[in-house]
Amino acid sequence: MKYLLLIFANEETKEILDRDRDKIWAEVDELMAELTESGEWVSGHGLGSPDQARRVRVQASVPVVTDGPFAEAKEHIAGYCVVDCASVERATEIAARWPDARLGGMEVWPMLG
């Protein structure tokens, strides 16, 4: 089954990433290589900064667009991974090994279809 692993960040995680970028990316590269070899890696991408985001909602058939950053948000989605593995426990294990789980945190979501 496929699972979406959402990566969260905040101002503190940005500072840590700026400081330890090479070490963190080396961990990511190693884990991605392992998941590729096992056939569990599907895809993943980092996302732009919150000031590049837009929220779109339709009210009375009219799109209402709000530019980021969103004041009410203390954290934001910084990226995602898609893995294809046997169970939610395995997906959770993968998320727990991802460096971002120690920083802003991660969520594991089953994908439908």
Segments from the language model and where they lie:
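Conserved, structured core segments of small domains
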Residues: 1-113
